[in-house]
Amino acid sequence: MRYLEKTLQLLVACGLAILVGCSEAPPPEAPAAEPQPKMDSLVSAAWLQEHLGDPDLVVLDATVVIESDAAGNFQSVNGRASFEAGHIPGAGVADLMGDLSDPDADDQYTLPSPEAFAAAMGALGVGDDTRVVLYDRMGMPWAARVWWMLRWIGFDNAALLDGGLNAWTAAGGELSTEAVARPPRTLSVNLRPDLIADQGEVRASIDDESIRLIDVLPAIHFRGEWTMYERPGHIPGATNIPTAQMFDETGHFRPDEELVVLFGDDHDTRTITYCGGGIAATLDAFVMARLGFTDIAIYDGSLDEWTADPENPMEICFECFGDSGE
């Protein structure tokens, strides 16, 4: 069982703070939208307010809520209730606890097959000629996960809403409680398998200086002073660039000129990011893609999988501070 709930709680503590319908026949597929210029992978609330009514634009809320019980145990909760309480008008739900993950896998949030993912996105109105804006209300790791999955199947016309739902409301954006069902579209699969790393590739990276391994968890976790997984520390050879370092104090992504200081400019090096369960790792990967890095993958199993195998080494380094400090 994964411990992703704890990973996301840790990231929040460090500064990141479906509709089910039945019908006798499926709705007719929407006609192809007019092709639009490729948009930036990061859009502002002002941009979204201006383009919200564009017929080719699909807005999706990818929120998963992290809740705790009286004993302090954390768990993931479907974001449906928070969506129904108020969302960006016209938005749909990108359900990472539902059909955007493999329902038959033992581990939560396991990637579905490319075809199943494309079909699920198509059911949300995402097609080859649409544009997609993704957001969440939990620091953007969930939105980044869906963004990376879209990229994995070859879809590049998606963006994150900078600052998430908080930025939308801060800019005066209204919230809606109305559900909107979009006609389904066809989303093609042009798979990019190199965007996902497996345990074997990560093992090989330990002795391969040509591969860069990035741990996106907070420095206290990287050093091994505290852990939520089977064993403390980090994968040998990894450097630490915590996800919290991607954001300013308002929850917006930091300017590119500041982020490039964290990641450097060796754009062609094979780079693998990891976290606890393959969600938060997509944030660093998203930033690196924006900065022009060309060979990035996320380790989907991350420390959930890695630390469960006693044959996989872990390194403790109390004097380490990571690339970005605390």
Describe each PLM feature range.
Residues 22-326:
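Cytosolic catalytic domains that perform sulfur/thiol-centered chemistry
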Residues 9-19:
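Bacterial N-terminal signal peptides
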Residues 1-11:
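Bacterial N-terminal signal peptides that target proteins for export
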